[in-house]
Swiss-Prot record:
Belongs to the UPF0758 family. The keyword Repeat does not apply. It comes from the Bacteria. This is UPF0758 protein SSA_1218. GO terms for molecular function: metal ion binding; metallopeptidase activity. Keywords: Hydrolase, Metal-binding, Metalloprotease, Protease, Zinc. A motif (JAMM motif) lies at residues 175-188. PANTHER family: DNA REPAIR PROTEIN RADC, UPF0758 PROTEIN YEES-RELATED. CDD domains: MPN_DUF2466. Zn(2+) binds at residues 175, 177, 188.
Length: 227
């Protein structure tokens, strides 16, 4: 990892370079420096940016850092940690929208692989609902809950609310198992059955319920006759 010396030439400052040449011309260190704005008593903002980037193996690792982990980095206080997580999440959503917008789902495996990339490394369980039209094109993806997925928090009301809002005809549920095992629990079975019944009452179809880990996935449609 290299370090940039800006010296006193204002034309080389990241903000000025971005305005003159465009954001795509800036290095990761320069972009991060623009966001952080200031350093600390011992380091410039460029040195803080350099140290953050040196502490991770790739930019992708940034999205897995918790607020507490970000604040262990000298120069990153509570406010900057919150701001950094917010901008990372915004980038994640932009990327997800570009990838999933109007994509047609032809099978559970393809969607499972995509969701493995998104949820496979998460340390908490996350329940996501994906809403599709009659051509099985994705209309919307909504995170329903983060924590421990149970029937009590996977109530159909919120899930069905987004289906009606986006005029969906079918739903796919996806959640991750941080343990790495994708074997469904009894609770997973109950959530699946409960949601299937709720969807049928509303004239919707529960197409699948996927359980994903970093390296594997489980499809209720492929593995059971529940769906």
């Amino acid at each position: 990892m290299y370090s940039i010396s800006f010296q006193d030439d204002i034309s080389m400052m990241p903000r000025e370079r971005l305005m003159r040449e465009g954001a795509e011309k800036l290095s990761n260190q320069e972009l991060l420096s623009i966001f952080l704005r200031t350093g600390n008593k011992k380091e410039t903002v460029f040195q803080v940016s350099q140290r953050i980037l040196s502490s991770i193996s790739s930019l992708n690792d940034l999205k897995y850092l918790t607020l507490q982990e970000l604040q262990t980095i000298s120069g990153i206080g509570p406010i900057k940690a919150v701001e950094l997580q917010a901008i990372i999440e915004l980038g994640r959503r932009i990327n997800r929208a570009e990838v999933l917008q109007k994509e047609q789902i032809m099978g559970s495996q393809k969607l499972a692989r995509k969701m493995q990339q998104e949820l496979g490394d998460m340390r908490q369980e996350c329940l996501v609902a994906i809403y599709l039209n009659s051509q099985n094109q994705i209309l919307h993806q909504q995170t329903i809950f983060m924590g421990t997925v149970s029937r009590s928090i996977a109530e159909p009301r919120e899930i069905l609310h987004y289906a009606l809002k986006h005029l969906a005809t079918s739903i796919i549920l996806v959640h991750n198992h941080p343990s790495g095992s994708v074997v469904p629990s009894r609770n997973d079975d109950e959530v699946t059955q409960h949601m299937k019944e709720a969807c049928e009452m509303m004239g919707l179809v529960l197409l699948d319920h996927l359980i994903v880990s970093k390296s594997n996935y489980y499809s209720y449609r492929e593995e059971t006759d529940m769906i």
